[in-house]
Amino acid sequence: MKQWPVKALFGKLLKVNHIFIMKRRIILCAAVLMAAVANTFACTNLIVGKNASADGSTIVSYSADSYGLFGELYHYPAATYPKGTMLKVYEWDTGKYLGEIEQARQTYNVVGNMNEYQVTIGETTFGGRPELADSTGIIDYGSLIYIGLQRSRTAREVIKIMTDLVQQYGYYSEGESFTIADPNEIWIMEMIGKGPGIRGAVWVAVRVPDDCISAHANQSRIHQFDMNDKENCMYSPDVVSFAREKGYFNGVNKDFSFSLAYAPLDFGARRFCEARVWSYFNKFTDNGKDYLPYIEGKTNTPMPLFVKPKHKLSVQDVKDMMRDHYEGTPLDISNDFGAGPYKTPYRLSPLNFKVDGQEYFNERPISTQQSGFVFVAQMRAHKPDPIGGVLWFGVDDANMAVFTPVYCCATKVPVCYTRVDGADYITFSWNSAFWIFNWVSNMVYPRYDLMIGDVREAQKEMETTFNNAQEGIEEMAAKLLAKDKNAAVDFLTNYTNMTAQSTFDTWKQLGTFLIVKYNDGVVKRVKDGQFERNSIGQPAGVMRPGYPKEFLQEYVKQTGDRYLVK
């Protein structure tokens, strides 16, 4: 087994941090340190209430899946502005200038999709009725996220800020589901415009119970909601009346379904979107079989918005779920002909295709090759904000990403998570984590089951090290925080940067290792992390894996006697 240098790198990290702390006259025992110690978006959000998590955290995840999206870690430093300052708004997807709005007098530090008060926002686009889009609006869904994070201290405050913004300036985007979370509660808010030239939006927000899990994945999921439960439900005053006016609904209020009115279900919404929610529910409840007929189109009875899990989920459980390809379920795509000889659980886009006039489809799992970035956000009410909020962040496909800890107080993001050297979606850089992780994953995709084991070893070693180090690092940060907040923030910023850089360096080494080991379709022999040599010092003989028996049988069936040895 190849030994990745994470422990050496982590030792370097601890040494640097120790020096950092010594400068502030805090003496720590080295033994304690070592004991502590690694197009339209098509996205997925997973949700875990604080009483459904193993450690009392609220947990939400987000994969930003889009061809064209460069994976980077955004940063908006805290700032103050004079009264009357204007903020230019650019569409997140395209960079198109949309207009100006009044800037807040005070904004908060935002790193990625979490702010310094542990408030986190994710999203998935459901589109909905196309006639409701308003191209005259100034606020797009991406701007709502990052402006909302810069101005809020709680999830409820975000909801008010976001809905006030679209009411005042107009909503530019399609229908959107937002996950809005803080250390105490998680909300799902769904929003759609009112049509060209009509300012504002119709929306509803529902609080996820603390003991439940939930998810959304590019299809509106809020059906009926309790209009009298002001503590757990918020909505625009015209959410029902507007649907009646447009002819989308003609029943009584209690029967109103936001989803059916504004985002009617079709095949793609069911199979490509709701199926990802089903996979999550199937994994962590005993009710997956009950919901499968809905995914297969045999019933129109929707899945519940939230469910109670059969056991409490850890942050690592959610990280692993973001790597899901329906393995072991009726929707598993790793064992049919489309998986090829090496059982790849990926399918190239487009999802739909035609053969002889008949339309077919490929499954769309949670983990997908076109992810720009992915995160699992951990928010904890029992810890101070600078320590309690951790954005476990990775770039590219979650299946082959490494989630590194990014603390919400960080005042500087790792260089490898930026547009270093001018890197973007069409500009490669050897110093960009997005491109290094894509380099590795695109080597693995064609020979998946031959190569994924090497990726898993490195991935597991990194993530296990970071997980095991978390408690000790946070104890150190808490001691600093008690004496000097700036010192604690600097320490966690330094830790955030060094873990990302060590991961980046390791992945570069992994890439070179994979090229050597699997070059030209053979496999080099490895022993104790080193490539083997023979008795005279030359490279040992290679292994020729060939093709699996099942693939060869299908190959002969397709080609007949063409390749028969006679």
Segments the model singles out, each with a brief description of its role:
Residues 43-141, 161-313:
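A contiguous strand-loop segment
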Residues 242-394:
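Glycine-rich, aromatic-lined ligand/substrate-binding cores of catalytic
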Residues 4-9, 13-27:
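Bacterial N-terminal signal peptides that target proteins for export
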Residues 458-566:
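Histidine-centered catalytic/metal-binding microenvironments
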Residues 341-479:
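Substrate-recognition/cap regions that form aromatic- and gly/pro-loop-enriched pockets
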Residues 145-151:
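Short, well-ordered beta-strand elements within core beta-sheets of diverse protein domains
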Residues 34-42:
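Sec/Tat signal peptide C-region and signal peptidase I cleavage site
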Residues 27-33:
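Sec-dependent N-terminal signal peptides
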